[in-house]
Every structure is written in structure tokens, then in C-alpha cells.
Curated annotation (Swiss-Prot):
InterPro entries: ATPase_P-typ_cyto_dom_N (IPR023299), ATPase_P-typ_P_site (IPR018303), ATPase_P-typ_TM_dom_sf (IPR023298), ATPase_P-typ_transduc_dom_A_sf (IPR008250), HAD-like_sf (IPR036412), HAD_sf (IPR023214), P-type_ATPase_IV (IPR006539), P-type_ATPase_N (IPR032631)
A single BP term in Gene Ontology: phospholipid transport
Known catalytic reactions: ATP + H2O + phospholipidSide 1 = ADP + phosphate + phospholipidSide 2
Binding site for Mg(2+): D879, D883
SUPFAM superfamilies noted in UniProt: Calcium ATPase, transduction domain A, Calcium ATPase, transmembrane domain M, HAD-like, Metal cation-transporting ATPase, ATP-binding domain N
Name used for this protein in its record: Probable phospholipid-transporting ATPase 5
Single GO MF annotation: ATP binding
Alphabetized UniProt keyword annotations: ATP-binding, Isopeptide bond, Magnesium, Membrane, Metal-binding, Nucleotide-binding, Translocase, Transmembrane, Transmembrane helix, Ubl conjugation
Gene it is expressed from: ALA5
Function of the molecule: Involved in transport of phospholipids.
């Protein structure tokens, strides 16, 4: 790493800084007043005692990321648990169960609730305990703090206060947000790693103010005192506004002097800093907001099912209470032995209405088993297992980066199987974000003969098309190379050369893919405009914020740059002979080599001002003074921004440069324009004075003042040229897009790149293809910002949308494909309320949608429009900080762990290392998780309806007595133990088809998108199946057992024998039903299903052997009453078969007469080549993929249609000529 010299002797006269980062002191200037709210923080440096009383008492440095503490855990956690309707119902039921009205023992209601809620609370507690232990570890870290008289002592982080002077040493984390005062380097710079903040691994350089450089050792802080007035705490990591008041002077502060908590000091021995923000006031803690809470569609539907069952529960409870009131009034007087006349009795026939109301409470408790109490906790367990399978899938592990897939939340697993629209970023997502400098335009001449991947792919396609038409001759591939660019809207000549003088093969260089001998090895000196080329190279080498690092093995410098583009520019400058090798606070140093002779000249450029690149400015400017004393302004930025700032005499190369930029964009390259101007001393001094005033202001208008100041100097530029770097497609992107298209998914691309670049990347990854009609919606240029001009532009866009919608709707060719392309400026109008639904209507009818030049906010707005306008599940995928908004807005957010940092990953629900892994995440895991959760929930409701309604039938059968036919311990174990494990196995291990089949038949994914397994017809079907099973279980058992000689001594079965027999049938029916539901068995499923049945027999055997004081009427019920009775075993077999018979009949009917796709595939897989019905093979081959108009497969289909058309036309012509020959006299 390039470093400044370690301190030996300070030479302040040689120390300067970037003007925008370290302006000169303003003599005699008073501190600026605090301007309004948001800028009220005052920090007394080295005087922490000043901050112990209000209003200057700020937060401590103790941080806690836990959700609970010892006092709040139980109330807050219980509140979270009883937000769920089912848990709230069971809480009320458990409370009522302690009263005499309850038909159950109170523990049969309380124990399951305590178990389920306790399990969930235990999970919350464990997660919070992990967070607490992490907090303890962080708060106990130690750092050196100035106590007094120049003495520093170790102190825990949590005891660091605002105003403390802190000394941080190499590889230590910063304990709070600090203002950098000095460092071990004489020029006051330090290197900081911010991976914990933004995930970026490249080091950032920080620079102290010049005035604080003498504070270079412990003793220097003995009498140090200063005041900081700055902004209030806020979450913006990249801004800071404030002033330092020191020695009666005011110095402006900005982000380059701020060291943020949780970033690490690297490659610097030590730094001194003063604490500005502590604890939750630090920027990292201000950013620790939670991602928006997301719930899957299945979970939301599940709530409605719960409400439906609650309505059913209330309905049958009302029926039961009405029946009881009837019985009380008309039949109870005859039952004298019940002593119904007592006033306190609930069965008093004098007041049947009161008796019915009281019985309603009993009925609500009795039928509560219709609501599955263990549903929520079972789903949580299953989703955690599913997420672990996603995390451990080796097919989604990236060998190059060593990064696996990561399910950051388990709440949305099943939502992965219902995605309708994917909205993707381009750079770093579809492309690698590893830039190669490929071409450039200098002084109106284009350099660089190497073709981009997009050009090669396009030229190959065009060569094939032209060869078919006989327009070019075949040339051996080994002797051809394609030059020039390709335009999708017009046909160009393809130049084929076997040899050329522009290129000499060389070893690959990272970031530099340029090939053109005209600029290499000093050959540029022989070009027609060598001075302009020299200026171009110097802009590349000087206009940046990178840090050089010497590679000792190669002897070359590599660069820690803020973006891959910047690193590629520096690599290009180095290869052209202009090597950036050193940076200090005041200067950059360049080694210039003008020819192949090896002569090297080292030059120093004093950096006077640096106006950094932002997404709003879209440009970067450096003002330097060269060794001759000339002040130069060097600027690079988006072509649209640079061109509008050109001087009249600076447009000499505007025409050819514009043409080259268009060609580069069509080749899929990222472009920037380069310009410069010379400044005289007076002009610079006047501007710098005004700019410093803007820098020292504190207030909400500071950014506006700075922008105005930058505009004052960034004008009258002279255009020198443009750069073109290639951002290659990631591995497997075209194949992944093709597979997703075959699965029926729609893909939108949202990018900040220009339209030409986005279009050609679209062609490269098969989102666009030849023959696809491109609908480009653009806004016409309008001067001024008046309401009238905006109205005209809006009407023009609306007119374009209307015409496009009509064109698409009137298209009769079923194979016609449309692509919608719109830029950010136009999108601003298209997203307004009165136009957005017309835009959406057009977009959903197009095969692909590409939005260019869009801002991060527009990305999020587009996602919101698609999500709310279509009502379908949306997935947003990106890799950068500018993608966070759309990732959080989408139903599912997927982050890619790329070189742009980890902000997208930290905001996402799932993260993957490469876009290509999205195919497996959705088509395999999404499909599996959707079907597992859907079947699991349906089965839960089936078994609880089947069980709960038997209580209602028995209630009616016994005169609405409010009596349960089952022992309380049976009820206790039913949901929690005896039927819970098999359903968890279903949710975790079920596979209707294997992963290979999912990828081979991607159209299976549409089962989730169409919600085939969790629509209301499927849900009601399972409910009806549960109702049928309950009828069979109750009435068949009653019919078999009631009034029959059950025991060998002629005794009939009592209530407990009937209840135990019915419960046995329920356990068998429920577990056999889930066995029939499963398509994929492992030994785990067998153990859990048949083990649950065995567990029932084991329980009842042990329980019935206990003394009567514990077992009550169940004493010896299995070995003495049920087991010896053949009718018990016959009833179990008969009832179980009858209960599952309709499901077996339904499946048989469906598989034979109306099979679903996975049924056919299962038979194909099972029978292999012995399958007799060849129609099934043909059917599944044609249905293996959804009909799509994008992707490589769509290209192939279009080509096949084209060939068939030509063949049919040829055959038609031959038939015509044959008929003419037959009719000719010669043939006669």
C-alpha cells in the first residue's frame, strides 16, 4: 500500500489538501450560526465533563441490539405471540377452562398452549440471547482515552463519552464516530476498511485538517481544547456537515475527516480522534433499522382460513347451545335424577335461554380443536429446516468467491415458488461489474479494435443470417476476426480480416482489454493529435480518488478504487505509459513514459480541489496545479452532463465523439466523456473564495450552495474524448434467463446505463432478439421547466403509450413479440398517478421490459407499481446500494454479494453469489417449498376438522350435554405429539419430483404461480375431506360398537371404550392420509408416520396401566377391554379404509383421467422406458416449458419458424412449377 512517510519532522509548508476537503483558514471569520433544526450538536473537545448535563448531555456509548430485556421480555414476547388469532383464542379458552363450565380438565387446554407459546418464546429468547452476548462482547472492547495531562488509559467502549480524545491503533475498530485529528503519517492521512458498514473491501482514505496535524503525540493533548458544531445524528453514511472552531478560527468539516464506528483502521500505526457521536447516535446504529416486515401470500391466506374456522366454530357452538336450550326446556323436567330445579344449576328448565347462553361458552371450549394450535409453531420449524437446506445447497455455492446461498429470513420460503415478475438490476447482477478498458475516442478518432462480447455474439448471428441469404462467403473461423460495431436497427457490413496491423497478442491484464498498437508503446506520438492524446492520458491518471498499492511480485501498481470503472481507467493509463504511483494529501504523482525507450519522467500535480462523483452530479472534477504553475480543471462524467458544459471552442470533436459514444453503447459498453479547461489565477482565486464560504456554512442549503459553486467552475470545458469499458455478462446468465422464461417468469431490467448499452446487453442475454419489435418510449426535449412545457411532454408520452397499447392489442400474429424500452426521464412522467396504469398495461403485454437511466427511487417505484398493479408476486434482485430500495419494496428481495458492497445483501431476504443461482433458488427450492407448505397447511386443517367435528357429533348424540368423548390426555397429545411429527416431515422432506426433473421441466414452476395447491377450491376440498372423515369415524364407530356385545362377558362398550376406539381410528386415518399425500419417502418419514401410530399404542398401554387414581376410567382399557375384542381391530381397519377411500378415489381418477404434469413425470420416472402410452411422453415434452418470447429457446423457435416458412414457400413454388410443366404442350 502506498503510504505517506512516517512522522519524523512535520513540514507544514508542504502540506495541502483537496480544496473541498481541507480549505484554508478564514482569518477573522466568526463561526457560522446554526441554521435551523438538524444542525444543533455542539461538542467540546477534550472536555467530556461539559456533556454531563442537559442540553449537552448526549447518549452513552452503550449499545444494545436486543429486542427485550429482563423486564420487557415476558410482556413484549407474550404480546407478539397473542397477535395471532389462533393463539388468542386458545388463551381465552385456557382462561375459561379453569371454571366449572369447561368440558375438559384445565390442563388439557393450558398445557398445549403453554407448550406452543413457550416454544415460540424460547426461540425468541435464544435469538435475543445471542444478540445480547454479541452486545456484551462489543461493549466490553477497550480503547485508549485521554484522561488528563497527556496521559491515555484503556477504557471500555461503553464508557467512552462525547468529547473524549481517543487513540486508535492499527487493525482496531473505531469505538464511536470520531473526527480525525492526526495520524502516524506526517500528512495526516489514514486508511480505513468499511466492510462492516457497507461491505466494501477496498480501503478508504481519510484526511485530517491541516490545523490539527501538530497533535501528533500523547503530550500534545495536554492543553488541547476546541469546539465542534455540526449536524444532528442521522443515518447517512456518506455526508457530514460541521465546523471546527480552534484557536479563534473556523474550519469546515466533511465526511473525509470522519471515522465511523465499526470501521477498522488499516495500514496506519495509530490515529487520534475526538468523539462526536456515541452509541445509538452513531451512523452505523442510525442505519440499524429493520427491513420491512414481509408476509407470504400463503400466510395471509392462512389467516383467512383461521377466521373461516372460527366462524364455523361459532356456528356449531350456537347450534349446540340452541340444542341445549331446547333440551333444557322440553326434556330436562323428565330427567328428575339430574335435579334440574336447583336455582344455581345451569340446567334449570325455568330459564332455558340462560342455560343456552352459558352452554355456548362450554361449546366454544369443546369445539376448539377445530383450530390447529400447533400450526404456527410447526410452520416455523419447517421453514427453518427449509432455509437450512437452501443454505447448504452445494449447487448454489460459488467456488470462486466461496460464498454460499443464504436464506436471511425463513418467512418467505414458499413465496419463492409463486414469483410472477423478476425485476433485475444490470450492472453487477446480469453483468460481472469487473470492468475492462476496451475502447476510447480521442480527438475525434476511435481507438481499440477488440470486439466486445455483445459485438461478437451479434456479428455471429448476422453472419449466419447473411450466409443463409448468400451475401457473404464462408471463411474458416480460425482466420476471421470481427471488427466494427453492430446496430440492431440497421444492417452493417461485417468486415472479415485474416490479418491486421492494429493488434499484437499480449498476456491478459486485469482491467485492460484494449488492443490497438496505435496508442501502445509510445506510438501515439505519431498520431495526428498527440497533444490531445497526452491530455487524455493525464486525465485518466489524475482525475480519481484511488489509492495505489505496489505488487511486490509483479512490480506493478494495483489500485484501491471507489468503483471498478476507476480502477480500469488507472490500469489503462498505466499501460499507456502514465502510471499513478503515489498520493499524498496535497499531490498525486505520475510516472510518464513517452516511448518504448524506457525513459521515465516523474511529475507531481498539486491537488487544489476535488469535486467528487455523486449519482446526482454524474461527474467528477479535479483541479490541479502542474509543475509549470498552470491550473488545470480535469473532468469526467456522463456524456449528457459534459456536453451541456462545453465551451463554444470546446466542441471541435463533439460530432465524431457523439458518434463513437453511440457505437460504444450499441456494443454494450459503459461510456464516460472526458474534458478539461485551463484556469487563470484570478478566476480560480475568486471562485475558490466563494466555494470556501459555501463549505463553511452549516445548514440545510449547504449542499445547494456547494452544487452552485461547482456549476460556476465546471463550465466552458473542452471536450477531449470518451472512454468505453466492458462489463461482461456473468457466467450462465443467458442460460438462466432462458430457463426462467421457460418457467413462465417475466423479467424486467432496471438499469442506470444509457439506452444503447442496455439494449445491447438485452441482446447478449437474449432478452431481446432479431424480429422482436422494440417500443421505445422517450420524452421530447423541452426548454425550461414551465408547467406548459411539462404538460406538452406529458401529453406526448401519454400519446406514445396509447398508440403502443393499441398496436399490441391489434397484433394478430401469435408469435409476435414486443419489447418495451423506456428511459428514466420519461419514466418520471409514466409513474405519475394519471399515467402509471397505462404504462403498466403496456408493460405486462410486452415480452420484455428495459428501463434505462433510472434512479434508485424510480427502481423502487417501478417495483411497487408492478406489485400493486398486477397483484402478483414480485422479486427484485440487485447487488448495489442503489438497489436497496427496490429489494425492500418487492415481495422477495434477493441480494447478490458482488464487488459493489453488501448493502443489497444486508437489505435482502435471500442472497446468492451469482445471478445464475436464481434459477435453482426459484425453480427447485421455490417449487418444493411452495408445495410443501401448501400441502402441510391443508393437511393441518383436514386433521383438525376431522377430529374436532367428532366432538360436535357426540355432543348432539348425547343431547348436547357438553361432554367430551375423549380422555383429557388424548386431547392434550393429539396436536402436540401424535400428529405433529409426520406433518413436519411432510413440510421438510416432501418432493413431488427431483431437482433434476424441476430443471428439466421448468413449466412445473407454474403450479406455484397459478397457486394450484393452495387456492380456495383446494382448501375447501381438504376441508370437505375432513368433514367426510369425521362423519365416517364417528358414525361408523357408533354403528359398529353401539349396543353391541363388546366384551367376552357380554358387556357393551362404555363411553371411554368408544372414545378410545374413535381416537385410535383418528390417529390411523390421519397418519395414513399423510402417507398417501407424500410423493417422496425416506426412512425418516416412515419412522415418524408409523412411529406416531406406535406411540399412541405405547402411550395408552402405559397410561392404562397406571393406578386408577391417575388413569381413572382408562384403567386397563387396552389390555383388558380393547385388545382382546376383535371388533376393536376390525373397526379400526374398516373405519381407516373408509376414511381415506375418497382421497384414494380422487387421486386415482385424477391420475388416470386428468393427470397433472407432475403425475405424468412421476410415472415416466417410475416406469422409465417401459411406459406404454407414448402420448404421455409427447405431452410432457411439449409442456416441459412455458411458451415464451424471450431467451435463447425463443430465438431458436423463431429461427425454426423462419426456416419452416422458407421451406413451405420453396415447396409451394416447386408445386406451382410442377403444375405448369404438367399443363405445358411438351408434357402432353
Amino acid at each position: 500500500m502506498a503510504r505517506g512517510r512516517i512522522r519524523s519532522k512535520l513540514r507544514l509548508s508542504l502540506l495541502y489538501t483537496f480544496g473541498c476537503l481541507r480549505p484554508a483558514t478564514l482569518e477573522g471569520q466568526d463561526s457560522q450560526p446554526i441554521q435551523g433544526p438538524g444542525f444543533s450538536r455542539t461538542v467540546f473537545c477534550n472536555q467530556p465533563h461539559m456533556h454531563k448535563k442537559k442540553p449537552l448531555r448526549y447518549r452513552s456509548n452503550y449499545v444494545s441490539t436486543t429486542r427485550y430485556n429482563l423486564i420487557t421480555f415476558f410482556p413484549k414476547s407474550l404480546y407478539e405471540q397473542f397477535h395471532r388469532a389462533a393463539n388468542l383464542y386458545f388463551l381465552v379458552a385456557a382462561i375459561l377452562s379453569v371454571f366449572p363450565l369447561s368440558p375438559f380438565n384445565k390442563w388439557s387446554m393450558i398445557a398445549p398452549l403453554v407448550f406452543v407459546v413457550g416454544l415460540s418464546m424460547l426461540k425468541e429468547a435464544l435469538e435475543d440471547w445471542r444478540r445480547f452476548m454479541q452486545d456484551v462482547k462489543i461493549n466490553a472492547r477497550k480503547t485508549c482515552v485521554h484522561k488528563s495531562d497527556g496521559v491515555f488509559r484503556q477504557r471500555k467502549w461503553k464508557k467512552v463519552s462525547v468529547g473524549d480524545i481517543v487513540k486508535v491503533e492499527k487493525d482496531e475498530f473505531f469505538p464511536a464516530d470520531l473526527l480525525l485529528l492526526s495520524s502516524s503519517y506526517e500528512d495526516g492521512i489514514c486508511y480505513v476498511e468499511t466492510m462492516n458498514l457497507d461491505g466494501e473491501t477496498n480501503l478508504k482514505v481519510k484526511r485530517s485538517l491541516e490545523v490539527s496535524l501538530p497533535l501528533d503525540d500523547d503530550e500534545s493533548f495536554k492543553n488541547f481544547m476546541a469546539t465542534i458544531r455540526c449536524e444532528d445524528p442521522n443515518p447517512n453514511l456518506y455526508t457530514f456537515v460541521g465546523n471546527l472552531e480552534f484557536e479563534r478560527q473556523t474550519f469546515p468539516l466533511d465526511p473525509s475527516q470522519i471515522l465511523l464506528r465499526d470501521s477498522k483502521l488499516r495500514n496506519t500505526t495509530y490515529v487520534y480522534g475526538v468523539v462526536v457521536f456515541t452509541g445509538f447516535d452513531t451512523k452505523v446504529m442510525q442505519n440499524s433499522t429493520k427491513s420491512p416486515s414481509k408476509r407470504s401470500r400463503i400466510e395471509r391466506t392462512m389467516d383467512y382460513i383461521i377466521y373461516t374456522l372460527l366462524v364455523l366454530l361459532i356456528l356449531i357452538s350456537c347450534i349446540s347451545s340452541s340444542g341445549f336450550a331446547w333440551e333444557t326446556e322440553f326434556h330436562m323436567p323428565k330427567m328428575w335424577y339430574l335435579r334440574p330445579g336447583e336455582p344455581i344449576d345451569f340446567t334449570n328448565p325455568i330459564n332455558p335461554i340462560y342455560a343456552g347462553v352459558v352452554h355456548l361458552i362450554t361449546a366454544l371450549l369443546l369445539y376448539g380443536y377445530l383450530i390447529p394450535i400447533s400450526l404456527y409453531v410447526s410452520i416455523e420449524v419447517v421453514k427453518v429446516w427449509q432455509a437450512s437446506f437452501i443454505n447448504q445447497d452445494l449447487h448454489m455455492y460459488d467456488d470462486e468467491s466461496g460464498v454460499p446461498a443464504n436464506a436471511r429470513t425463513s418467512n418467505l420460503n414458499e413465496e419463492l415458488g409463486q414469483v410472477h415478475t423478476i425485476l433485475s438490476d444490470k450492472t453487477g447482477t446480469l453483468t460481472c461489474n469487473q470492468m475492462d478498458f476496451l475502447k476510447c475516442s480521442i480527438a475525434g478518432t476511435s481507438y481499440g479494435v477488440r470486439s466486445s462480447e455483445v459485438e461478437v455474439a451479434a456479428a455471429k448471428q448476422m453472419a449466419v443470417d447473411l450466409e443463409e441469404h448468400g451475401e457473404i462467403s464462408s471463411t474458416p473461423q480460425s482466420q476471421t476476426k470481427v471488427y466494427g460495431t453492430w446496430d440492431s436497427s440497421r444492417t452493417q457490413e461485417i468486415e472479415v480480416e485474416g490479418d491486421n496491423n492494429y493488434n499484437t497478442p499480449r498476456a491478459p491484464i486485469k482491467g485492460f482489454g484494449f488492443e490497438d498498437n496505435r496508442l501502445m508503446n509510445g506510438n501515439w506520438l505519431r498520431e495526428s493529435q498527440p497533444n490531445d492524446i497526452l491530455q487524455f492520458f493525464r486525465i485518466l491518471a489524475i482525475c480519481h480518488t484511488a489509492i495505489p498499492e505496489l505488487n511486490e511480485e509483479t512490480g506493478k501498481y494495483t489500485y484501491e478504487a471507489e468503483s471498478p470503472d476507476e480502477a480500469s481507467f488507472l490500469a489503462a493509463a498505466r499501460e499507456f505509459g502514465f502510471e499513478f504511483f503515489k498520493r499524498t494529501q496535497s499531490s498525486v504523482f505520475i510516472r510518464e513514459r513517452f516511448s518504448g525507450s524506457g525513459q521515465i519522467i516523474e511529475r507531481e500535480y498539486k491537488v487544489l480541489n476535488l469535486l467528487e462523483f455523486t449519482s446526482k452530479r454524474k461527474r467528477m472534477t479535479v483541479i490541479v496545479r502542474d509543475e509549470e504553475g498552470q491550473i488545470l480543471l480535469l473532468c469526467k462524467g456522463a456524456d449528457s452532463i459534459i456536453f451541456e458544459r462545453l465551451a463554444k471552442n470546446g466542441k471541435t470533436y463533439l460530432g465524431p465523439t457523439t458518434r463513437h459514444l453511440t457505437e460504444y453503447g450499441e456494443a454494450g459498453l459503459r461510456t464516460l466523456a472526458l474534458a478539461y479547461r485551463k484556469l487563470d489565477e484570478d478566476e480560480y482565486a475568486a471562485w475558490n473564495s466563494e466555494f470556501l464560504k459555501a463549505k463553511t456554512s452549516i445548514g440545510s442549503d449547504r449542499d445547494e450552495l456547494l452544487e452552485t459553486g461547482a456549476d460556476m467552475i465546471e463550465k466552458e470545458l473542452i471536450l477531449i474524448g470518451a472512454t468505453a469499458v466492458e462489463d461482461k455478462l456473468q457466467k450462465g446468465v443467458p442460460q438462466c434467463i432462458d430457463k426462467l422464461a421457460q418457467a413462465g417468469l417475466k423479467l424486467w431490467v432496471l438499469t442506470g446505463d444509457k439506452m444503447e448499452t442496455a439494449i445491447n446487453i438485452g441482446f447478449a442475454c437474449s432478452l431481446l432478439r432479431q424480429g422482436m419489435r422494440q417500443i421505445c418510449i422517450t420524452s421530447m426535449n423541452s426548454e425550461g421547466g414551465s408547467q406548459d412545457s411539462k404538460r406538452v411532454v406529458k401529453e406526448n408520452i401519454l400519446n406514445q403509450l396509447t398508440k403502443a397499447v393499441q398496436m399490441v392489442k391489434l397484433e394478430k400474429d401469435p408469435h409476435a413479440a414486443f419489447a418495451l424500452i423506456i428511459d428514466g426521464k420519461t419514466l418520471t412522467y409514466a409513474l405519475e398517478d394519471d399515467m402509471k396504469y397505462q404504462f403498466l398495461a403496456l408493460a405486462v403485454d410486452c415480452a420484455s421490459v428495459i428501463c434505462c437511466r433510472v434512479s434508485p427511487k424510480q427502481k423502487a417505484l417501478v417495483v411497487r407499481l408492478v406489485k400493486e398493479g398486477t397483484g402478483k408476486t414480485t422479486l427484485a434482485i440487485g447487488d448495489g446500494a442503489n438497489d436497496v430500495g427496490m429489494i425492500q419494496e418487492a415481495d422477495i428481495g434477493v441480494g447478490i454479494s458482488g464487488v459493489e458492497g453488501m448493502q443489497a445483501v444486508m437489505a435482502s431476504d435471500f442472497s446468492i453469489a451469482q445471478f445464475r443461482f436464481l434459477e435453482r433458488l426459484l425453480v427447485v427450492h421455490g417449487h418444493w417449498c411452495y408445495k410443501r407448505i401448501a400441502q402441510m397447511i391443508c393437511y393441518f386443517f383436514y386433521k383438525n376438522i376431522a377430529f374436532g367435528l367428532t366432538l360436535f357429533y357426540f355432543e348432539a348424540f348425547t343431547g348436547f350435554s357438553g361432554q367430551s368423548v375423549y380422555n383429557d390426555y388424548y386431547l392434550l397429545l393429539f396436536n402436540v405429539v401424535l400428529t405433529s411429527l409426520p406433518v413436519i416431515a411432510l413440510g421438510v422432506f416432501e418432493q413431488d419430483v427431483s431437482s433434476e426433473i424441476c430443471l428439466q421441466f421448468p413449466a412445473l414452476y407454474q403450479q406455484g404461480t397459478k397457486n394450484l395447491f393452495f387456492d380456495w377450491s383446494r382448501i375447501l376440498g381438504w376441508m370437505c375431506n375432513g368433514v367426510y372423515a369425521s362423519l365416517v369415524i364417528f358414525f361408523l364407530n357408533i354403528g359398529i360398537i353401539y349396543s353391541q356385545a363388546f366384551r367376552d362377558n357380554g358387556q357393551t362398550a362404555d363411553m371411554d371404550a368408544v372414545g378410545t376406539t374413535m381416537f385410535t381410528c383418528i390417529i390411523w386415518a390421519a397418519n395414513v392420509q399423510i402417507a398417501l399425500t407424500m410423493s417422496h419417502f425416506t426412512w425418516i418419514q416412515h419412522v415418524l408416520i408409523w412411529g406416531s401410530i406406535g406411540m399412541w399404542y405405547l402411550f395408552v398401554a402405559i397410561y392404562s396401566m397406571m393406578p386408577p387414581s391417575y388413569s381413572g376410567n382408562i384403567y386397563r382399557i387396552l389390555d383388558e377391554i380393547l385388545a382382546p375384542a376383535p371388533i376393536y381391530w376390525m373397526a379400526t381397519l374398516l373405519v381407516t379404509v373408509a376414511a381415506v377411500l375418497p382421497y384414494v378415489a380422487h387421486i386415482a381418477f385424477q391420475r388416470f383421467l386428468n393427470p397433472l404434469d407432475h403425475h405424468i413425470i412421476q410415472e415416466i420416472k417410475y416406469y422409465g422406458r417401459d411406459i406404454e402410452d407414448a402420448r404421455l411422453w409427447t405431452r410432457e415434452r411439449t409442456k416441459a416449458r412455458e411458451k415464451t418470447k424471450i431467451g435463447f429457446t425463443a430465438r431458436v423457435d423463431a429461427k425454426i419458424r423462419h426456416l419452416r416458412s422458407k421451406l413451405n414457400k420453396k415447396q409451394s413454388n416447386l408445386s406451382h412449377f410442377s403444375a405448369q410443366d404438367a399443363m405445358s404442350p411438351r408434357s402432353l
